[in-house]
Amino acid sequence: MAAMLGDAIMVAKGLAKLTQAAVETHLQNLGLGGELLLAARALQSTAVEQFSMVFGKVQGQDKHEDSYATENFEDLEAEVQFSTPQAAGTSLDFSAASSLDQSLSPSHSQGPAPAYASSGPFREAGLPGQATSPMGRVNGRLFVDHRDLFLANGIQRRSFHQDQSSVGGLTAEDIEKARQAKARPESKPHKQMLSERARERKVPVTRIGRLANFGGLAVGLGIGALAEVAKKSLRSENSTGKKAVLDSSPFLSEANAERIVSTLCKVRGAALKLGQMLSIQDDAFINPHLAKIFERVRQSADFMPLKQMTKTLNSDLGPHWRDKLEYFEERPFAAASIGQVHLARMKGGREVAMKIQYPGVAQSINSDVNNLMAVLNMSNMLPEGLFPEHLIDVLRRELTLECDYQREAAYAKKFRELLKDHPFFYVPEIVDELCSPHVLTTELISGFPLDQAEGLSQEVRNEICYNILVLCLRELFEFHVMQTDPNWSNFFYDPQQHKVALLDFGATREYDRSFTDLYIQVIRAAADQDREAVLKKSIEMKFLTGYEVKAMEDAHLDAILILGEAFASEEPFDFGTQSTTEKIHNLIPVMLKHRLIPPPEETYSLHRKMGGSFLICSKLKARFPCKAMFEEAYSNYCRMKSGLQ
C-alpha cells in the first residue's frame, strides 16, 4: 500500500510540474504575465504542499520506498527541464548544422542509426553511427537515464531505429516551427523498417518440408473455397464494373488470400518471388483485393530466427565474421523473397547493409515453382495460358541467377561505374570483405521506396519518373545490360540529397546487339504509329510467325502501338490518366488463346521492366513529354551503330 502511494506521489508531482509548464506557456502565449503568472505558480506550490501533508504519514512509515520514489522523481525532474518561455536561451536551433557539443555523448549511442549512411552521397551531419534530428541539435535532455543498468555494466543495448535527438524547453513558437518542419518532406529523415506484420519463422530447408507447406495450402484453399461458395458471397465485378483477369475464381476469398500470403511468406524463395511479380501489376490485370494482399508479400517476407541466420553467416563468412564489425543488428530491417537485410557497423565506423540469403532457397527453385503453379492451377486462380511452360522455364533460369550474390555484386559494381557521374542516380558501394555466394554487403543508404513518394510535389515526381524512363532506354540501347526487376523498393529516393539509389541487381541481364537492333526499330515504328512497320519487325523478331489469325495479329499490333503512345506525341503524356494497362488488359485473352509461338525469351524480363517503369509513372501520376527522350536514344543508337561498322 505504501509503495502504491509513493508511486502516486511521484505521479502527482509530475503532473503538477507538467501543469505548471503548460499554464505558463499558455499565459505567455496569450500575453498574460506578471501577477497571473505568479498566481499560477503559487497555486501549483500550494497544491504540492497540501498533497504532501495528506500523505506525510505514509511517507514516514516507509522511508525506503519514499526516498526511492523521491530520488527517481528528482532524477526525472532534473532531466526533463521544463524551462519557462521567459527563461534565457530556451529557443530551439532548427539548423541541421547545430554544434555537436549539444548532442548526446557517444557513450550513449546504442548501435548504428539505420536511417542514414555514414558515407557516400547520403551522409548526414552528426557523429558516426548517430541519427541527425530533422530539427537539428537542441538544448536540454528528455528522459535520458545516465544510470542505465545496461550501460553501467558495460553492455551496449540495441535500440532499433531510435531517435537520439534531445529536446529542451519549448515555446509555442518552437512547437509551430517543429510542426512546419515535420510537414516538409525535404526536412524529414527517412528510415527503412521491417513490416510490422513480418514474423520470425524458420525457413523450411528440405524439399519435403517445403512440399508439406504447399500441401497444407492446397487443403486450406479447398476448404476456404467451399466455405465461400456456401456463403454465396463471391463478387466477380469490381466497383467500376470492370472484370479483372484474376477475379473469376471461387478460391479467391479473403481467407484464402491470407492463406496464400502466409504460406509464401513462410517458404519464401521462388514461390514468394512469383507472388511479388503479381503484386506490381495494375488493378486491371489482378483482383484489387488480391493485389493489396500481395502488396504485403512485396513489402516484407517473414524473417529467419537468430540461430538459423547465424548458422548461414558462419557457413559463408567463417566463424569469425563478427571480428570485422563493431556492431551487428540481429533483427533485420528488410526481408524479401530470397534474403533478409541487417544493419551493421564496421570497425572504422562505416555503416553497411548485409543481405543474407535464406538457406535452401537456391536448391528448391524448380520444386517451389512447380508446387506453387500446381496449387494455383488446381484452384483456377490464373487464366489458362497466363504462365505457359516457356515462361515458367525462363523464370526458373532467372531465379537461379538471382540466387548468386557474387554475380549480383559484379553487376552492382558495373552499374556503379556506368552511373558514377550521373547527377540523379546512385549505386551503393559493394563491401567485398563481407560478400560471399550467399551474403551481399553494401554501404547503407537512406531514403524511402517510390511507392511512398506519392506525397512529393508534382515537379519532383515528374523528375523521378522522367529519369527512370531515360535510364530504361539507356540500359537497353546504350549499356546493353538492364536491371530487369521494377519492384518499387529497388528505387530509394532521398529527399535531402535529391537522389535515387538503385538497389538489387540480381535480376540483371545483358542484351545482344542483334536483339536491340530489331527491337529499337519496333519502338521506332510504334512511336510513328506505323502499323505495317510494326508487323514487319514483329515477324523478324519472331513475335509472330505471319500465320496468326487476324484477331491475334490485330491484338499484338494494338498492344505494341498502345505502348508506343507515350513516345508518339510531343505534348506532355499524362501517366496518371492514361488507360494503357486497361487497353492491354482487354487484349490479353485474345493473345493467350491464339498465340502460335512464345515471344523471344529476352522480352519477358524486358517487358517486365518497361511495364513496371510505366506503372511507377502511373502510380506517381507523372506528366511530361516522352517523344524527345526516345528520339535522343534512337539518334544515339544509330550513331553508335554506324561508328561500329
From Swiss-Prot:
Location in or out of the cell: Mitochondrion membrane
GO molecular function: ADP binding; ATP binding; enzyme activator activity; kinase activity; protein kinase activity
Record: transit peptide: 1-159
Keyword Methyltransferase: no
Family: Belongs to the protein kinase superfamily. ADCK protein kinase family.
Function, as annotated: Atypical kinase involved in the biosynthesis of coenzyme Q, also named ubiquinone, an essential lipid-soluble electron transporter for aerobic cellular respiration. Its substrate specificity is still unclear: may act as a protein kinase that mediates phosphorylation of COQ3. According to other reports, acts as a small molecule kinase, possibly a lipid kinase that phosphorylates a prenyl lipid in the ubiquinone biosynthesis pathway, as suggested by its ability to bind coenzyme Q lipid intermediates. However, the small molecule kinase activity was not confirmed by another publication.
Protein name: Atypical kinase COQ8A, mitochondrial
Biological source species: Mus musculus
